[in-house]
Structures are given as structure tokens and as C-alpha cells.
Amino acid sequence: MELDSALEAPSQEDSNLSEELSHSAFGQAFSKILHCLARPEARRGNVKDAVLKDLGDLIEATEFDRLFEGTGARLRGMPETLGQVAKALEKYAAPSKEEEGGGDGHSEAAEKAAQVGLLFLKLLGKVETAKNSLVGPAWQTGLHHLAGPVYIFAITHSLEQPWTTPRSREVAREVLTSLLQVTECGSVAGFLHGENEDEKGRLSVILGLLKPDLYKESWKNNPAIKHVFSWTLQQVTRPWLSQHLERVLPASLVISDDYQTENKILGVHCLHHIVLNVPAADLLQYNRAQVLYHAISNHLYTPEHHLIQAVLLCLLDLFPILEKTLHWKGDGARPTTHCDEVLRLILTHMEPEHRLLLRRTYARNLPAFVNRLGILTVRHLKRLERVIIGYLEVYDGPEEEARLKILETLKLLMQHTWPRVSCRLVVLLKALLKLICDVARDPNLTPESVKSALLQEATDCLILLDRCSQGRVKGLLAKIPQSCEDRKVVNYIRKVQQVSEGAPYNGT
């Protein structure tokens, strides 16, 4: 991104500022550098390098007391000018849209970042010296103007991204460390929300600086902005995040509402963080929770397993908030919940799904939905039965994650809906016995530990099924040990029979 584009032509306010600084030779020199950067000739790389070198020399040669001197009641002067310079430098070092995927601009962006990082280190060094030597608000005013742009620069280039190199990341991390040191903050979270109750923190300032780049029309112009916003958001938790909800929620929705899966996932992670760290009352106000639900649940139609995983985890934490508005009087059927809607959609997608990664993702989250609905899972019993039987029949690879999670789901289902299980005894018994036989004779390279886990879970399900059917499983299994030649299968069948007869069993 060109530095001159970050510095607009001097406004009337800038002219007044230059007049205020005219008494200071240092102020005049700084103004000259700013004007040089704003000229069309500054587009040439050698001119920029010369200006950056002049700026570095000027900072080094200037005493700290002159660097932070100001005029007027609000101490406008050099501190404000330094803030303008910091903003311009941050924009100059920011990667352009073309550099998101690396390529020729990759090394150039990293080189610019390293140069700017060294300038920021010099400025922060001056602030540290002034802090240790001056009494009064001068250095604090200067730090106030510097902190936001310096932070954005540091986060942009300290994360491992296509536009960074080990050198640029090292410099950016040094800048962040120096910034935390000079602000006397023990962590980035403390820097953002304040180290104590009396300290305001700097999140409002940083969100204000990021805001122009987070609109729907502009957020893709700088590929780093979404990562800076997301990373910053993740650092702020309860109770500080709620006061910034009006700023962080729209930006998170914008990022999630994109055609690129990577951005969808990033946006959903941001929304999930908001759900976890903002009080339910604030989310229910102005129908925000419903907006979140519709924005997030729409992603369930995108068949991408990483996205589906992020969406389901977020929805499971959002359901308790949404259900606070539901009231059941007890004189009729309970109202259908958002959890019902999502589970119905998941089961619709699960039945015909053949892609293993998606099957595992759905199966991984199914137990949480059954637990969430409890006895109300009976509304979905027929479809759950079809999904469970279908998934138990399909080999899922050496780790067998899908079948293990489906067995866990079946156990929970029988525990929550046991009065409705006995009429499905034969179907479930056949599916479980077939699974035990298939696993016991499995010729694949499935580890023995995984086979044992599958057989153990299937045995637990048979025991639960027997209890739900008042001991009918025991009678149906009575002749199997006599006719089955597979010793491993017979051993697990006998375990079920022994427990049914009252013998202790450590598997349930």
C-alpha cells in the first residue's frame, strides 16, 4: 500500500497545526517530511526510502523533551503530529490486496514492515525515555496518539501470514513487546481493556482506527485487517467485551458473510467469541441473538467440514440464549426450538452424505444435540434411527471416529428416550450385532485399541438396550454362543448376558 495514499493533502486543520509548530525548527522539519510524503513524486521507491531515512535520522537526533512538546490547552502539537506520522507509517507497511497470496509483492511488503518497525522502535524508545524523565501529560499525550497505529502494525506483521517473513515478524514482535513495556501492561489483553478497573484501555481507539477498513465495501482492500480484528477480538473477554458490542458485531457479521470459506470460518469464530463473552441480556436486546442465529445457521448449507464444525459449536452455545425467550405453560406441546430446527437439518444432510470428513463432523456433534434436547429427542427418533443404523454399517477409517460417536449418540438416545426404545429392539439389535461381527473380523489396518473401543461401546449399547426392553435382549441372544464360531464375538455376547443376569460390569 502506497504511503502517499495514506496521507491526504493537508487540510485546514493541518495548516493550523503547521502554524502552531512554526516556532519550532523540529516541528518545521517534521511538517516538511509529511508534505514530502504527500507529493506525487513520493510514489517512487527511492524517494520513500530517502524520506524514511530522514525520518529515522530526525527521531534519533531529537531530544525526547522536544519530541513531545505541545502548545495550547489540549497539548496539540508534536504529539498529534507523531500520531499522524504513526498512522501513515502503519498504512505504508500494510499489505496490499495483491499481496494476500504472496508472490512478487511478498518480500517487498515484509521489507517495508521491517523498516517501519525499526522507526516505531525508535519512537517507543523516546517515549520510554520521556516517561522516566518528565512529570506531566506530555509523554502520555504522545503515547495516546502513537499506541493505536503501533499496535495495528505489530499485530499485522507478527502473525504468520503470506506477507511476512521471519525478519519482519521478529521486528513486529519487538515492537509489540516495547509497546507493552512502555504502556506498563503485562499482556495484550491488559493493553486493550485496561490493567485495572480504573484504566479505560485502548480497544475503543483501535476499533476506531480499524472501522474505516471493516466496511463491506472496504474490508478486502487490506488482507491483514480481518486477522488483526479477529485476533484483537479474541483477546477481550467478559466483562469488557459487552461495552464494545455495537462495534465488533457488525464487523464479525460482514466477515462471515463472504463467499470464501476461509472468511466464513474466521467470521463464525468471531461470532462464537461474542456469544461466549457477551451477557445473554445484551444479545437478546434488539433481536441480536436472532440475527446471529440466522447468520450462522445459513452456513450449514455449505458442505465444508471445517466450517460446519465451527458453526455447530457456535450454535450449541447460542441455543441456551435463544431459549431464554421460550416459555412453556405445561398445558400443551412444548414449542419447537432452534435446536430442533438445526438437528432436523443436520439429519437431512447426514442421511445421504458420503464424504467421510463431513460424516465425521456431523457424527462428532450429534451427541451434544441429543444431550441438549433430552427427552424432546423423541421428535427426531425415526430419522435418528435411520442415521444411526446407516452410519454403523460403514467403515470410517482406522480411527473410526464416526462410528464411535454414533455409538455414543445411541447410548444417550436410549437413556433419554427409553420408553420408546423397546419397539425398535429388533432393528437396533441387528445393527449392533452386525457391527460386533464386522469389527471382530475386520481385515483392515484398524488398531486393536480402536477395535476394542468399538466393541466396548457396542456392548454397552446392547446392555442398555436390554434394560430398555425389560431383558428381552438376553433371550434373543441365548442361542448365539452355541452357533457362533468366532470366539471374540461370543465373549462380548456373554458379557451382555452376564450383566443382564445381574453380574457386575465395569463398562457401564
Curated annotation (Swiss-Prot):
Gene Ontology biological-process entries: positive regulation of DNA damage checkpoint; protein stabilization
Keyword entries, A-Z: Disease variant, Intellectual disability
Keyword Thylakoid: no
Gene Ontology CC annotations of this record: nucleus; TTT Hsp90 cochaperone complex
Pfam families assigned to the protein according to its UniProt record, in alphabetical order: Tti2
Entries under InterPro entries matching the protein: ARM-type_fold, Tti2
Coiled coil: none
Chain intervals for the UniProt region annotation (Disordered): 1-20
Domain of life: Eukaryota
Clinical note on disease: Intellectual developmental disorder, autosomal recessive 39: A disorder characterized by significantly below average general intellectual functioning associated with impairments in adaptive behavior and manifested during the developmental period. MRT39 affected individuals show delayed psychomotor development, severe speech delay, short stature, kyphoscoliosis, and dysmorphic facial features. Behavioral abnormalities include hyperactivity, aggression, and stereotypic movements.
Assembly notes: Component of the TTT complex composed of TELO2, TTI1 and TTI2. Interacts with TELO2 and TTI1. Interacts with WAC; WAC positively regulates MTOR activity by promoting the assembly of the TTT complex and the RUVBL complex composed of RUVBL1 and RUVBL2 into the TTT-RUVBL complex which leads to the dimerization of the mTORC1 complex and its subsequent activation.
Described function: Regulator of the DNA damage response (DDR). Part of the TTT complex that is required to stabilize protein levels of the phosphatidylinositol 3-kinase-related protein kinase (PIKK) family proteins. The TTT complex is involved in the cellular resistance to DNA damage stresses, like ionizing radiation (IR), ultraviolet (UV) and mitomycin C (MMC). Together with the TTT complex and HSP90 may participate in the proper folding of newly synthesized PIKKs.
Family: Belongs to the TTI2 family.
Protein name stated in the entry: TELO2-interacting protein 2
The organism of origin for this protein: Homo sapiens
